[in-house]
């Protein structure tokens, strides 16, 4: 990762930071991670009273923070030769920039606008139509539709079943006052992380981080109780596609935070063995003309939820799902092949090491690892040392046909 040793720590005002110098690169990147996202809509105040923000509130704040009283932060970054952006998902909101020059100036700009919201009723009302247009665009996308439909079939109460941007109706309910209240709950310093990669000035970064003021809140997030069972096994929606797209999902029990890293890596091994390009499942699916290419595979876990998803395009989604279930049953009966496990370990190590090859990919990786309070070294060690028994245990205990879902868009 470069000649200078990485640094991690916490400022006197509780801002966590990871500085990952890469002296061989001209490109630099910085990100502020707020460990609050679309799933964090249910809160209790200091008196124990329940407060619920509208679905899509975290995403709305992300849009609005770039609009400052002094002007547009995007424009300011551009004038400094930087490219800035942001994104929100269920668990976090991330603001970042990349540049080659004026890194410190851009870092100060990033830290400044994230700490200083400027919400007015006029600007909030104007933003609603922009976000509602974005929601409408996603609603017309079959891939987003089939994924969202899968989550609705899995979860009844947990906000993970909501679209990150909310709906046109929930966005309409947002007010400047509600945004300010949500900002004060979400953007506490102890839930924020600064990450810097590339040929960056470590001392100046630490000085800038120490100047970040402490923000605290007496509000506490909570998640409604969610039953173990799924709500539906099969649902399809008609969108006039020439070939159906589908998501095969498995709902799991929530994973304790201290086990997130090992579970994610163990699940990575499992998904590759079960349905990767070299798997028996894909070879059979290809020979039977069920699939032309391997399924997309992903595992997600966070506060109060965990699930795996397999995405694909094919004329016979139900037959594909049944074949996957049969392969899963076979592996549960016969165990994971040692050869496959060793091969995938090498593949995952290669993929991980390639991530070190650019400031952007390393920063994006550390964004995910910071959510688990881990570093690249922790991830590398886990990939190298994960015992096959850990993946076997997941195989036997997590996957169950009773919590298997098929979401289809035709």
Outline where the language-model segments fall.
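Second-shell loop/turn segments in exported
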Residues: 47, 64, 94-98, 118, ...
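Short, flexible turn/loop "capping" segments at secondary-structure junctions
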Residues: 24, 86-90, 161-163, 184-190, ...
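Flexible, glycine/charged-enriched surface loops at secondary-structure junctions
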Residues: 219-224, 293-298, 334-343
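Helix N-cap motif at beta-to-alpha junctions
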Residues: 99-104, 198-203, 313-318
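PAPS/PAP-binding and catalytic site of the sulfotransferase fold
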Residues: 107-110, 194, 205-210, 320-328, ...
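Acidic/histidine-enriched segments that form metal/cofactor-coordinating
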Residues: 69-182, 292, 322-329, 336-376, ...
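A structural supersecondary motif
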Residues: 247-254, 273-314
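His/Glu-rich zincin catalytic helix
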Residues: 1-73, 180-284, 403-410
């Amino acid at each position: 990762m470069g000649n200078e040793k990485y640094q991690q720590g916490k400022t006197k005002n509780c801002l966590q930071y990871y500085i990952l110098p890469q002296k061989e690169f001209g490109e630099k990147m910085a990100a502020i991670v707020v460990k609050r996202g679309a799933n964090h809509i249910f809160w209790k105040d200091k008196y124990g009273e329940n407060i619920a923000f509208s679905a899509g509130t975290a995403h709305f704040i992300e849009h609005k923070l770039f609009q400052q009283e002094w002007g547009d932060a995007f424009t300011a970054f551009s004038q400094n030769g930087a490219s800035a952006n942001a994104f929100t998902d269920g668990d976090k909101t991330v603001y970042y920039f990349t540049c080659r020059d004026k890194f410190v100036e851009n870092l100060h700009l990033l830290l400044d606008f994230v700490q200083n919201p400027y919400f007015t009723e006029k600007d909030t009302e104007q933003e609603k139509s922009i976000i509602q247009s974005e929601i409408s665009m996603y609603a017309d996308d079959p891939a987003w539709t089939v994924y969202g439909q899968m989550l609705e079939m899995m979860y009844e109460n947990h906000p993970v079943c909501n679209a990150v941007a909310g709906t046109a109706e929930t966005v309409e309910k947002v007010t400047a006052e509600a945004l300010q209240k949500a900002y004060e709950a979400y953007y506490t310093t102890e839930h924020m992380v600064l990450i810097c990669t590339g040929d960056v000035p470590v001392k100046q970064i630490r000085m800038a981080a120490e100047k970040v003021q402490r923000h605290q809140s007496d509000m506490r997030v909570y998640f409604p109780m969610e039953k173990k069972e799924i709500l539906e096994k099969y649902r399809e929606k008609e969108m006039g596609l020439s070939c159906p797209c589908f998501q095969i999902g498995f709902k799991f029990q929530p994973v304790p935070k201290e086990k997130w890293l090992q579970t994610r890596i163990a699940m990575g091994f499992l998904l590759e063995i079960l349905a990767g390009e070299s798997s028996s499942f894909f070879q059979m699916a290809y020979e039977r003309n069920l699939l032309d290419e391997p399924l997309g595979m992903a595992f997600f876990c966070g506060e109060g939820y965990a699930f795996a998803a397999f995405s694909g395009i094919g004329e016979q989604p139900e037959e594909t799902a049944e074949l996957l279930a049969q392969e899963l049953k076979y592996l549960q009966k016969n165990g994971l092949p040692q050869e496959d496990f060793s091969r995938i370990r090498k593949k995952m190590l290669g993929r991980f090491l390639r991530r070190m090859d650019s400031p952007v990919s390393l920063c994006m990786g550390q964004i995910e690892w910071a959510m688990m309070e881990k570093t690249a070294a922790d991830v590398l060690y886990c990939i190298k040392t994960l015992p096959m028994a850990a993946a076997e245990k997941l195989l036997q205990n997590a996957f169950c046909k009773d919590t298997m879902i098929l979401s289809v868009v035709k």
